[in-house]
Design a protein with these regions (language model features):
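Conserved small/polar residues in nucleotide/adenosyl-binding loops
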Residues: 150-152
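Soluble periplasmic/extracytoplasmic beta-strand elements of cell-envelope proteins
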Residues: 6, 146-148
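Catalytic palm subdomain of template-directed nucleic-acid polymerases
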Residues: 117
Length: 152
C-alpha cells in the first residue's frame, strides 16, 4: 500500500527546509495564506521564492497553499456571495499559477462557529460547500483542492 506523507510547513520553517525534508514528503502544505478584502493575501509568506528549490529536490512532491488557520478571519464574509467566492477563487488561481503550486488547502476554523473569535454565520455550511465547488471550477480537476476540518 502506498501512503502519502503530508506536512504543514509554517513560513519560517520553509527557510530551514532541507533536501532530506523534501525527499521524505509526498505533499507539503504551506501555512498560511489569509483572506483580506475577500481575496487571497500572501503577505505572511516571505519564502515563496524558495519553492523552485523544493521542486528541484523532489520534483514529485506536491506543494499546496493552505489558507486560513486558527483565528483567520474573512471566510464567512467572502463565501457569503457567489461574487465573493468567484473573486477569492480567481485570486487563488492567480497565486497557484504565479508560484507553480499544485493546489489550495482550506483551513476554515470554523464554519458556523465563532469559537476562534472570527465572523460566523449559520449559512456558512452551505457557503463552504459552494466555496469548494467554486475553487474546483477555477483550479480545474488536475489541481488539489483539500480541506482541514473537524465537523460541520
Amino acid at each position: 500500500m502506498k501512503y502519502d506523507v503530508i506536512a504543514y510547513c509554517w513560513n519560517d520553517a520553509l527557510a530551514g527546509f532541507t533536501r532530506e525534508d523534501a525527499q521524505r514528503l509526498t505533499h507539503v502544505n504551506l501555512a498560511f495564506g489569509l483572506i483580506k478584502d475577500g481575496l487571497l493575501d500572501l503577505h505572511l509568506l516571505k519564502y515563496l521564492h524558495l519553492l523552485p528549490k523544493l521542486r528541484e529536490w523532489n520534483p514529485e512532491m506536491k506543494i499546496v497553499l493552505s489558507v486560513g488557520g486558527w483565528g483567520a478571519d474573512g471566510f464567512s464574509d467572502m463565501a457569503m456571495t457567489e461574487e465573493g467566492r468567484r473573486n477569492f477563487a480567481k485570486s487563488c488561481l492567480d497565486a497557484v499559477e504565479k508560484y507553480n503550486l499544485d493546489g489550495i488547502d482550506i483551513d476554515w476554523e470554523y464554519p458556523c462557529n465563532d469559537a476562534a473569535g472570527i465572523g460566523a454565520d449559520p449559512r456558512d455550511k452551505e457557503n463552504f460547500t459552494a466555496l469548494l465547488a467554486t475553487l474546483r471550477e477555477y483550479l480545474g480537476k488536475d489541481r488539489i483542492v483539500s480541506l482541514s476540518l473537524i465537523h460541520i
